[in-house]
Amino acid sequence: MMAPQTTRNDPRQRGQEAEERARAYLEGQGLQTLARNFRTRRGEIDLIMADGGVTVFVEVRRRSHPGYGGATASVDRRKRQRLSRAASAWLARHPGWARFDVVATDGHEVHWVRDAFREES
């Protein structure tokens, strides 16, 4: 049996492309990549970056159509809680200051929202 081919219509591939664009953009802004797709039982973080002495947990959102609402608004309470729990696991091993950012891509532009939300329990 042959593996299915991935195409530009594959949501996973589009998500990976959005994450790569976000990573390249943030590195261009002076941040350093610490980890990609950090997974725990509690959740996953798309990108973990360093901005000076601050650890930045980045949620990447791809929106194909502005009518679906803003990418930042799509990070609902449940998603914020999962991100917070995964971030706690990272910070248990790498203590320090941290913030949560959202990077939204629409295929052509990258929008970076620094300190998009606070940790939730």
From Swiss-Prot:
One Pfam family it belongs to: UPF0102
Organism domain of life: Bacteria
Region feature Disordered, mapped onto this chain: 1-20
GO function term, MF aspect, one: nucleic acid binding
Ranges of biased composition (kind: Basic and acidic residues): 9-20
Family: Belongs to the UPF0102 family.
This protein's name: UPF0102 protein Hhal_2103
